[in-house]
């Protein structure tokens, strides 16, 4: 019916102080932020034996730091090993702290209708890198890192924007696990040192 909206919009009795909540959040932010960390020490940075590999989280939204938009972790790849293989919608850059190796990247064709579909392209591109290099991973690219040395570890710093998650775009998919992955392993400095020297056998 024409102009039916002129009456329909009045329906409903629910009241919620959503705008006031925004004002309250803004007014309390300075005091809240004053308690958040601006400097993190190594003992503040948790380890994780993840499906992607051995990680030491440097900045994460769960770590109560002042960083609002970026997550970062250090990845350790033992001699002769590799990371897991995954893809995500957010672009990523990695700084090579130590070691040398290569990446395998595979672009995907994307179709977005009512649902999201991706199909890997046939071509897989290899990128060589060494300490001091920066690796760029484009959005939605399947990628994996390989340590080319049989006796020296690789350490990478990964940085990724967390805003994409707030936009509903946390499309992270693990396609292959790192050889060392074992959910029963609890990492500490001594255990990680064993991986660095190639003394710990991969789980598979």
Question: Which positions does each model-derived feature cover?
Answer:
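A short, N-terminal "cap"/entry segment at the start of jelly-roll beta-barrel domains
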Residues: 1-68, 174-177, 184-204
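Conserved short histidine dyad/triad with adjacent acidic residue
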Residues: 56-60, 71-88, 104-110, 139-140
